[in-house]
């Protein structure tokens, strides 16, 4: 600083960006700015006539060494022990837009699972021409054993019939396979396929069970689906992975020993009729993979023969579905409670929610030098669900038993620091926190008691939709929550 006072201090900055169409000419990238400037001031500078000369102001955020600038440049330099003479590289990106609360849909019991149907969702794309424009729907599964289909106005268009009564009725997972087909499973160890039809006015619908898939001997924790190939993956509490098809012709017969007693008796006597019996089938394969419950099983969207399974035994397995064999095993430090696939140009990544309250990013390739790429910290209870952004490859949302959802931007990272973060590699912190609206003005219980989030999904049309212990589906929307 020498001859200048703190009030007069200036800092040389170098502006960079990966935003297409918003690059500065080489001659304008270096600039002297006041040391006390903040994000808003920097954003105004960039939008000015002498810089980008934007037709309308674009709000920007700025990354410095992988973290968002939330102070003045002066404070940043002081906090990091850097001289004012240092050139600061600022990567500018379009500002993050907070997800705004939109609506909640009431249920009679805990909401265990949600899935989304829209023109931009996987199920909408799998539906092809059968998907009708504007037929955006939410699927919810609950511990009362019921499936519900909702429209955007909060109207329950259809509710499934009760298949089981008693302690085994609860559902753990449900997925759209198309606009007319749904897969669901849970405590009774059975996968059920439902056909969904709507009335001509689209104000009511009907759910009809058409196929039951038997093979597991324990609770089914979650489902992975690929509507294009009509296949389903199941993650079972007994440590096994199931591969199934919804094609009655291709699926093998169901094992008689696992069928409900009434049906098994009728089948032995040859008295079954198509009029009163839902078709039953078995698994294409059941793979004993893990030593503890499997939390998630997901298809690789880039390779139809590959799948991934995450387990409470601390491992992520890469599976060859053609041979039903484990290709590789990646051991982590904690029990894995959820997982999703992140599309990435440089390498595939699996985001796994853990029992240690973190989200771990894992490179599943055998050739990877380091399997744990990054750790996302911020939750204070188990991370029960993760979902990738529909807009880009560097953001995701997580849901936790602490009663919150957190949005993460993987461009904002820092090196691990201190004993607490030893071995975590790069560390990321959330950019937004979504609370449960059901709390109202009440303070959130520390461990999330009463408002635990069990599932969250992110779709370009719907936004972020979550369900949980408060018996509600909650919708939070925001255009370009994290801009691509």
Curated annotation (Swiss-Prot):
InterPro entries to which the protein is assigned, alphabetical: G-protein_beta_WD-40_rep, NLE, WD40/YVTN_repeat-like_dom_sf, WD40_repeat_CS, WD40_repeat_dom_sf, WD40_rpt, WDR12/Ytm1
Chain segments annotated as coiled-coil in the UniProt record: none
GO biological process per UniProt: chromosome organization; maturation of 5.8S rRNA from tricistronic rRNA transcript (SSU-rRNA, 5.8S rRNA, LSU-rRNA); maturation of LSU-rRNA from tricistronic rRNA transcript (SSU-rRNA, 5.8S rRNA, LSU-rRNA); protein-RNA complex remodeling
WD repeat intervals: 121-160, 166-204, 215-254, 289-329, 331-372, 378-418, 448-484
Gene3D superfamilies tied to this protein: YVTN repeat-like/Quinoprotein amine dehydrogenase (2.130.10.10)
Superkingdom field: Eukaryota
Ubiquitin-like (UBL) domain: annotated span: 11-94
Gene Ontology MF terms: ribonucleoprotein complex binding
Pfam families noted in UniProt: NLE, WD40
Its job: Component of the NOP7 complex, which is required for maturation of the 25S and 5.8S ribosomal RNAs and formation of the 60S ribosome.
UniProt similarity note: Belongs to the WD repeat WDR12/YTM1 family.
UniProt-listed PANTHER family: RIBOSOME BIOGENESIS PROTEIN WDR12, WD40 REPEAT PROTEIN 12, 37
Known partners and oligomeric status: Component of the NOP7 complex, composed of ERB1, NOP7 and YTM1. The complex is held together by ERB1, which interacts with NOP7 via its N-terminal domain and with YTM1 via a high-affinity interaction between the seven-bladed beta-propeller domains of the 2 proteins. The NOP7 complex associates with the 66S pre-ribosome. Interacts (via UBL domain) with MDN1 (via VWFA/MIDAS domain).
Record's protein name: Ribosome biogenesis protein YTM1
Gene: YTM1
């Amino acid at each position: 600083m020498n001859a200048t006072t703190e009030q007069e201090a200036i800092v040389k900055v170098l502006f960079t960006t990966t935003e297409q169409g918003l690059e500065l000419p080489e001659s304008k990238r270096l600039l002297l700015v006041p040391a006390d400037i903040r994000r808003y001031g920097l954003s105004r500078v960039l939008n000015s006539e002498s810089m980008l000369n934007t037709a309308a102001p674009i709000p920007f955020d700025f990354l410095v060494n992988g973290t968002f600038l939330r102070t003045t440049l002066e404070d940043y330099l002081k906090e990091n022990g850097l001289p004012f003479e240092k050139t600061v590289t600022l990567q500018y990106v379009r500002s993050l837009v907070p997800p705004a609360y939109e609506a909640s849909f009431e249920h009679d019991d805990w909401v265990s699972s949600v899935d989304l149907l829209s023109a931009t969702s996987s199920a909408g794309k799998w539906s092809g021409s059968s998907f009708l424009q504007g037929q955006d729907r939410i699927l919810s599964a609950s511990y009362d054993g019921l499936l519900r289909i909702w429209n955007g106005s909060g109207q329950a268009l259809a509710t499934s019939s009760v298949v089981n009564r008693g302690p085994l009725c609860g559902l753990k997972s449900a997925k759209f396979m198309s606009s007319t087909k749904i897969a669901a499973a849970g405590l009774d160890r059975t996968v059920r396929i439902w056909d969904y039809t709507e009335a001509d006015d689209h104000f009511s619908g009907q759910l009809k069970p058409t196929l039951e898939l038997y093979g597991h001997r324990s609770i089914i924790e979650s489902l992975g689906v690929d509507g294009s190939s009509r296949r389903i993956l199941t993650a079972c509490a007994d440590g096994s992975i199931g591969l199934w098809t919804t094609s009655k012709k291709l699926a093998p017969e169901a094992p008689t020993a696992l069928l409900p007693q009434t049906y098994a008796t009728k089948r032995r006597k040859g008295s079954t009729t198509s009029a009163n019996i839902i078709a039953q089938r078995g698994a294409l394969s059941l793979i004993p993979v893990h030593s503890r419950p499997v939390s998630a099983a997901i298809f690789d969207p880039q390779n139809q023969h590959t799948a991934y399974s995450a387990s409470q035994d601390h491992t992520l397995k890469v599976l060859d579905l053609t041979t039903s064999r484990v290709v590789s095993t990646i051991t982590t430090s904690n029990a894995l409670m959820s997982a999703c696939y992140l599309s990435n140009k440089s390498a595939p990544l699996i985001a796994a929610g853990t029992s240690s309250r973190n989200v771990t990013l894992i490179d599943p390739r055998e050739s990877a030098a380091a399997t744990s790429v990054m750790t996302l910290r911020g939750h204070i209870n188990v991370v029960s669900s993760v979902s990738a952004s529909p807009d880009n490859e560097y953001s995701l949302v997580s849901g936790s038993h602490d009663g919150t959802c957190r949005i993460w931007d993987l461009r904002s990272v820092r090196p691990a620091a201190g004993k607490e973060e030893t071995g975590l590699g790069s560390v990321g912190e959330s950019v937004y926190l979504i609370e449960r609206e059901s709390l109202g003005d009440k303070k959130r219980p520390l461990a999330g008691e009463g408002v635990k989030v069990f599932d969250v999904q992110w779709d370009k049309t719907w936004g972020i939709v979550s369900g949980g212990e408060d018996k509600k589906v909650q919708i939070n929307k925001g255009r370009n929550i994290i801009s691509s």
